[in-house]
């Protein structure tokens, strides 16, 4: 008798792979080989709903939120979220109460929450009133424990001119943003208190924004303070360190206090997909210029790279979808899917009300891409969870645009970046049976809503 199983197999065409697995119980957040998602500029109420309705059922392990702290009011640009005015949890994305409710809802759905933490700097504005009503001026930011004054900022008051100069990168200003003196015990404690406040709301970990601009020793001290507390002991951290050849500051420096995002992975993936050279990806995980797999946060794009063209983005159509399938199928790193909104202007923020609040995301209408709901992402999250713990097996390629590989006896994926169909019989390690292609559909109720592929007793 033929059977439809929740394993995995792929097909031809531009992107194919398989199986939808049930969500596993919530673990301690990454790293646990459950993929995450960044819901960029989504409101807290929208994220809460998405955790319950989509992320939990799909098997996502965690969600990264945009920075939750009070920010400068400049206009509708997305980057105002990255210009802190105070560490109050109040922003154009929602209130403290809404953030706490979101964390509770997500954890109830088996999804942990990671906050994007801006700790390198305050705003780049000369003065004004923050989103929550906090007045500020150049190098003067009030706070509940005294806030920051001129003595709490680095002596270099000019912008970074050379990324070959470590001192400039870590002590001067990043595009005019007022650079905090993170070597100061006072500043370190202020930042640690902010992070612990988020932990008290149930936040599981942090993406440290602009970590490259903070000396690694300073971050180790700050995060050491957080982890010295009972509530912060197991907090997860992934650093944003944009590595570039020939520069003195590299991601590996920051592994003492957390994992690091692997930008080289995303750049390389773009190049190989767009040049139809998927075959060269076979040994990607062993390349010496990449971080060890268990320390690398990987992505196809993030909010910066989708705007500067450094990586693929939703604007690249099929190439982008194919790259996400590969990332979620290939055994390297801790993957995160990026899901933001469509834009034509680099600075354009998410849709907002007349008073500046970001509007709740609406998938299927409006400008939010909802890329995390696509079959190539949501169903592949299930695939990755189903094959967790298996290694790469049965690699095949045609020397160029076509590749296929297995994940032990649990899954198999075939990808074709070429312009013509790839048709062949593949050797797999799968038990005999009928398998559901989860890019064209999904396994549901013992049946397959997409293409079914049969594997014989020899695994072909």
Identify the residue ranges that each predicted region occupies:
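Secretory targeting and sorting signals
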Residues: 1-28
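Active-site-proximal helices and loops of the catalytic beta/alpha 8
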Residues: 30-36, 40, 44, 50-56, ...
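Short glycine/proline-rich turn/loop motifs
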Residues: 31, 169-183, 201, 305-308
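Core domains of carbohydrate- and sulfate-ester-processing enzymes
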Residues: 130-175
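Active-site cleft segment of glycoside hydrolase catalytic domains centered on the general acid/base Glu
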Residues: 171-185, 212-223
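Alpha-helical scaffold elements lining the catalytic groove of polysaccharide deacetylases
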Residues: 182-194
